[in-house]
Regions:
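Bacterial Sec-dependent N-terminal signal peptides
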Residues: 1-23
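Glycoside hydrolase catalytic-domain context in secreted enzymes
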Residues: 20-218
């Protein structure tokens, strides 16, 4: 439990730059060290608050003790703003955001630099929306034409998807916005997706379904 809370605090501290004009990202080691110090000053109730979600797209912090709230926005081809869930005191939220080309179109360019610039642009719009985390990119492998979210993903090739997502995440996180890779793992149908069972052997998981996620983390 302590490691879970430490990780949350470290993430919160590492993404506090989203309201500034220029991202000032600290390293993971720096954030973890600072999180350890912040954790010492939190009450038990404050620690418990950090172990669960609070409404959608929101994780409570402890602003009085230097730990900001974490606001998240959903994404596929840009930033989806939900004004009711964002803090009106943080920044002046834009009424509209850019409709970017779908991720499958980005993958079809085979252009790593473009993927990086795409992620950077989405990252800046996330910050303009007053959020620190973008719930994206979507990156499941395109295995079935029946998947209703194929347009969000980066194609059927694990290597290409990995190259695209690695550059996308690099660009996005250079702005101070944290990427949240989704939807782990083998999410290849929208029909009853919270109830269905994906039967996949270990080799397929390791060779096809997880490489892109690993690339996004590394």
């Amino acid at each position: 439990m302590k490691k879970l809370i430490l990780s949350f605090v470290a993430v919160a501290l590492a993404t506090t730059a989203f309201a500034q004009k220029k991202a000032e990202m600290m390293s993971w080691d720096e954030a973890y060290t600072k999180a350890t110090e912040v954790l010492k000053n939190l009450s038990l109730d404050e620690k418990i608050e950090m172990t669960h979600g609070h409404n959608q797209f929101f994780l409570p912090g402890a602003p009085a003790k230097g730990l900001p709230h974490i606001f998240m926005v959903d994404a596929s081809a840009g930033v989806r703003i939900n004004h009711s869930l964002l803090d009106p005191n943080e920044v002046r939220h834009p009424e509209k955001t850019t409709q970017f080309p779908a991720n499958i179109m980005l993958a079809s360019t085979f252009n790593n630099e473009l993927a990086k610039r795409y992620g950077e642009a989405v990252g800046w719009e996330t910050r303009m929306a007053g959020a620190g985390v973008l719930l994206g990119p979507g990156m499941n492998i395109y295995r079935s034409s029946q998947c209703g979210r194929n347009f969000e993903y980066l194609g059927e090739d694990p290597y290409l998807a990995g190259c695209m997502v690695a550059n996308y995440v690099t660009g996005m996180q250079s702005t101070g916005t944290m990427a949240c890779l989704k939807h782990f793992l083998a999410n290849n149908t929208e029909y009853l997706r919270r109830l269905s069972n994906s039967v996949v052997d270990e080799r397929a998981i390791m060779e096809i379904y997880t490489p892109a996620f690993k690339a996004g983390i590394d």
